[in-house]
Design a protein with these regions (language model features):
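ABC transporter nucleotide-binding domains
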Residues: 2-7, 12-207, 211-213
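ABC transporter nucleotide-binding domain
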Residues: 172-262
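Alpha-helix N-cap/helix-start and coil->helix boundary motif
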Residues: 11, 95, 119, 193, ...
Length: 303
């Protein structure tokens, strides 16, 4: 298998604290990998080790087939990154920042700067000083620098940070185009679970430094179990009636009953009729579906 990112037993400790604990990542070329976790779970520390910004306590890191070493060697000409807030010179304009980055990358094409300005919607801010930009436009500038040299791999820490809803959609569509049209591999951390759900082809969940679950996009779809949520003034009677009617497991959650039996989910009117006839009419009846956010919260709560 040809991996864009490969780690084996990746561990980073600060004293007695293991920020990253034996993480094994396998990110295939061309995929969009969403890296989820609470604040302090180890996302940014993992990303910094992938980029050679910090050295792991133990384990091995390979990026685009090259081992990331202490001497700074790696495939960095083929990697674009944005980690936390982009560093800028307040007195330089957007265009000057990108021109400086173009020279540092030794890019001979003078149109590269104009290309990323257009890609990131920065045309009207191109000659504005970075110190006057909003947080969202600073994030766009950071993404423009990451894309300037047309990398094969993008490593992004919270790429939607500071963007308004329209900006989030723009960046999502840009990343999708890069992956689908150019085969760019994208490894991104985010706390916006809905965006990861829409964008990622595979999702990894890190908690307390450990990679506790990985999901393919198809698995994310299948985990969304539909269920029927019922509220009534007489939960005891309702529960007894539904159990006797062989509707499978009847789960009590606070002031509600839930049924996962497909017969109940597909025909809630039958459940309503049954409860009305039994003298326990429902005051609330709705088909609900678990999403990635609920699954994530249940998972980390169970660890």
């Amino acid at each position: 298998m040809d991996y864009a990112i490969y780690t084996e037993g990746l561990t980073k400790s600060y004293g007695a604290v293991r920020a990253v604990d034996s993480v094994n990542l396998r990110v295939c070329r061309g995929e969009i990998y969403g890296f989820l976790g609470l604040n302090g779970a180890g996302k940014t520390t993992t990303i910094r080790t992938l980029l050679g910004m910090i050295h792991p306590t133990a384990g091995r890191v390979e990026v685009l087939g090259q081992t990331v070493t202490r001497n700074g060697r790696g495939p960095w000409r083929q990697v674009g990154h944005l980690v936390e807030a982009p560093a800028v010179y307040p007195e330089l304009t957007v265009r000057e920042h990108l021109e400086m980055a173009r020279r540092l990358h030794n890019l001979s094409d003078p149109k590269a700067t104009a290309r990323v300005i257009d890609q990131l919607g920065l045309a009207i801010y191109a000659d504005r000083k970075a110190g006057t930009l909003s947080m969202g436009n600073l994030q766009r500038l950071g993404l423009a620098r990451a894309l300037l040299h047309e990398p094969a791999l993008l490593i992004l820490d919270e790429p939607a940070n500071g963007l308004d809803p329209a900006g989030v959609v723009e960046i999502r569509e840009l990343l999708q185009r890069l992956a689908h049209e150019r085969g760019v591999t994208i490894f991104m951390s985010s706390h916006i679970l809905t965006e990861v759900d829409r964008l990622a082809t595979r999702i990894g969940i890190i908690h307390q430094g450990r990679l506790i679950e990985e999901l393919e996009a198809k698995q994310v779809e299948t985990l969304r179990t539909r269920r029927l949520e019922i509220q009534t003034r007489d939960l005891t009677t309702a529960r007894s009636i539904l159990t006797n009617a062989a509707y499978g497991s009847v789960i009590t959650q606070g002031a509600s009953l839930t049924l996962s039996d497909p017969r109940a989910v597909e025909a809630p009117d039958e459940i309503a009729r049954l409860l009305v006839n039994a003298g326990a009419p429902p005051t609330h009846l709705a088909v609900v579906q678990e999403n990635l956010e609920e699954h994530f919260l249940q998972l980390i709560g169970a660890v």
